[in-house]
Amino acid sequence: MVAPGVYRSGHPNERNFGFLKRLNLKSIIYLANDDYRENVVQWANREGIRIFHHRVTMNKEPFTEMDEDEVASALTHILDERHLPVLIHCNKGKYRVGCVVGCIRRLQRWSHISLLEEYARFAGEKMSDEEFIERFDLSRVKLDPVHCPSWL
């Protein structure tokens, strides 16, 4: 759990559906360029779960970086209590999710050291992601003060 009502994982599969159902998810945030797996789409539709697909590439030195507009849009969805509980995932649940969670931690005013330690627990050290988290412009995230979670 990232925060109350916010969960992170790798790509869900049929073995996970029973557990995910118990989370009473309202939405899923998928952070990847790949098309979403049809079996997960069908399951989410049956469960009434809304899928937000943000086409986010991984940070790869020296020239490929995550699209800040996509990350800001994903954060806007995650930080709207009308979408909670929410599952955030990419393929492995490490790098892209780690960057988004790192940005959430900055919005929560975590220390830089603490958020990097959390990132490293899930993904190890990756300089390009650490730099992305540090320099991401938080003002790009459009927070709705009426629907912002109380833990933010």
Give the predicted meaning of each segment.
Residues 1-88, 92, 99-152:
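Cys-dependent protein tyrosine phosphatase-like superfamily
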